């Protein structure tokens, strides 16, 4: 992937620039790390209404570099990576048939709350399959989201079964649709982003655990910052193009940083002692399973790559461990300390980090 950020064309819908978003650093970091390494497993963003969740996610999708896709392919198939090719494209590659390649923006797919399983996964036209002997597949939202971002607002209100389907595809990278003995399989590798307001209900713990990271966001309380945010939004709404032009240099720099991190990621290593200590933290917090250990290691590596380093430091782990573990702790109604502080406390003890005076 190469950096390809151009100034927004006058015909394309203008999106609020990612680098202009004030505060919400925890959410921004979680999103960036998932883009650098999608295997982290997505991010769940829980917080107050009107805190810029949707704005930030759209801004991230707009910031990302263009990707190469096979022309007229409904699955955004990669022309070079077999893991991201549909069956038809793979057959064409194997037979050395020339492919028409185009560049396109990373797709961001919004999943509506009322979506059905057929709309999400796609459907097979049985009549056509039986009468014409062809696999007539109508791709769903998972096909459209391949190699992009799938955003579910109010994910805590979505049907549990649909959340399961999304998490299975995000984890495995493939979507399988079966009906009447006919089976279709296509790549569905995307960054899953869910957001919601905890007042409207929590996700079941088994589903929550499947999200790689969990960011909590709060309404900005400082009056000066609130005024700055309101002024920025007003300026953007009145003159979007000049406003975006002010941030073009910062946007290009961040995009280049993301691309460099993606290229550097395979070379990043994490010391054995640090890995043992991460597992020690997870064990002490009584985290079920090993997802917490795996995701923390991946996120720390992605952060090191983002900072341009090939070795993970204690500071990298410190910045990601709360995001990776806070939603995996068992809820204790009598506990007065919140889960993030609990993770931080155990991390400092295990890693021997002393609070600065």
From Swiss-Prot:
Keyword Ligase in record:
yes
Instruction: Give GO terms: molecular function aspect only.
Output: ATP binding; ATP hydrolysis activity; magnesium chelatase activity
**InterPro entries given in the database record:** AAA+_ATPase (IPR003593), CHLI-like (IPR045006), ChlI/MoxR_AAA_lid (IPR041628), Mg_chelatase_ATPase-isu (IPR011775), Mg_chelatse_chII-like_cat_dom (IPR000523), P-loop_NTPase (IPR027417)
First-tier enzyme category under EC:
ligase
Q: Which Pfam families match?
A: AAA_lid_2 (PF17863), Mg_chelatase (PF01078)
Tell me yes or no: is ATP-binding among this UniProt entry's keywords.
Answer: yes
Provide the residue positions that the database annotates as binding ATP.
Answer: 47-54
Pathway where it operates: Porphyrin-containing compound metabolism; chlorophyll biosynthesis
Listed under catalytic activity are: protoporphyrin IX + Mg(2+) + ATP + H2O = Mg-protoporphyrin IX + ADP + phosphate + 3 H(+)
Q: Which UniProt keywords apply?
A: ATP-binding, Chlorophyll biosynthesis, Ligase, Nucleotide-binding, Photosynthesis
- What's the superkingdom here? Bacteria
The EC designation for this entry is 6.6.1.1
Q: Which NCBIfam families match?
A: BchI-ChlI (TIGR02030)
Report the sequence similarity comment from the record: Belongs to the Mg-chelatase subunits D/I family.
PANTHER family recorded for this chain?
MAGNESIUM-CHELATASE SUBUNIT CHLI (PTHR32039), MAGNESIUM-CHELATASE SUBUNIT CHLI-2, CHLOROPLASTIC (PTHR32039:SF9)
The UniProt function text for this chain reads: Involved in chlorophyll biosynthesis; introduces a magnesium ion into protoporphyrin IX to yield Mg-protoporphyrin IX.
In Swiss-Prot or TrEMBL terms, this protein is called Magnesium-chelatase subunit ChlI
Gene field: chlI
């Amino acid at each position: 992937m190469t950096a390809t950020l151009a100034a927004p064309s006058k015909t394309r819908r203008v999106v609020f620039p990612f680098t202009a978003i004030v505060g919400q650093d925890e959410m921004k970091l979680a999103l960036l790390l998932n883009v650098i390494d999608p295997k982290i497993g997505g991010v769940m963003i829980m917080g107050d209404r009107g805190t810029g969740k949707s704005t930030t996610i759209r801004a991230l999708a707009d910031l990302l570099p263009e990707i190469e896709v096979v022309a007229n392919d409904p699955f955004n198939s990669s022309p070079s990576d077999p893991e991201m090719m549909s069956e038809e494209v793979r057959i064409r590659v194997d037979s050395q048939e020339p492919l028409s390649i185009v560049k396109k923006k990373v797709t961001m797919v919004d999943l509506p709350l009322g979506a059905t399983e057929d709309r999400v996964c796609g459907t097979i036209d049985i009549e056509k399959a039986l009468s014409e002997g062809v696999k007539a597949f109508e791709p769903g939202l998972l096909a459209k989201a391949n190699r992009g971002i799938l955003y579910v607002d109010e994910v805590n209100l979505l049907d549990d079964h649909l959340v399961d389907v999304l998490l299975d595809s995000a984890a495995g990278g493939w979507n399988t649709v079966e009906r009447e003995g006919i089976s279709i399989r296509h790549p569905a590798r995307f960054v899953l982003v869910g957001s919601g307001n905890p007042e409207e209900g929590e996700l079941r713990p088994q589903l929550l655990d499947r999200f790689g990271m969990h960011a909590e966001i709060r309404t900005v309380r400082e009056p000066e910052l609130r005024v700055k945010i309101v002024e920025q939004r007003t300026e953007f709404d009145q003159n979007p193009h000049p406003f975006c032009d002010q941030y073009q240099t910062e946007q290009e720099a961040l995009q280049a940083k993301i691309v460099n991190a993606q290229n550097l990621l395979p070379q990043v290593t994490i010391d054995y002692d640090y890995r043992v200590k991460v597992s020690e933290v997870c064990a002490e917090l009584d985290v079920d399973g090993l997802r917490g250990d795996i995701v923390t290691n991946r996120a720390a590596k992605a952060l090191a790559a983002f900072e341009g380093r090939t070795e993970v430091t204690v500071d990298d782990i410190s910045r990601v461990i709360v995001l990776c573990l806070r939603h995996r702790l068992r809820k204790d109604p009598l506990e007065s300390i919140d889960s993030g502080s609990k993770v931080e406390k155990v991390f400092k003890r295990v890693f021997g980090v002393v609070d600065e005076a």
